[in-house]
């Protein structure tokens, strides 16, 4: 369905939760090194429950390698500096969603590289005075919107593809 790219994730439970999200939505999770934890970390396994076998997880030595692996679809960077809401984007299968780490976000060099690859920068709106949304929550919000726009393709529940799309937001 979609590619989720995490740039240097630091907190095992966030990544574990996203493994579970990928299993439930048909997405592929791409982890860009260095990681702030070992892939066998107990907290990662606990958060991902038994979904690890159901979700494709790829590791990449660099952002360049990750972008090469997902070439072909559109690239979206989801960061607090975005000028357009994720809800205004029109997602298609094969698109890639790039997120920064929990404490540092996406470094400027990575943002420059993503822009050079044609990335569009999106933001998740939030109240003034707040810095960011939890990484696992942010990814979930965007992935479910992207999946909704595509009729929840592959969902087990019959009839979900007939759910009308929300009107375009100006």
Name each model feature, range by range:
Residues 1-170:
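Post-transcriptional modification and biogenesis factors for structured RNAs
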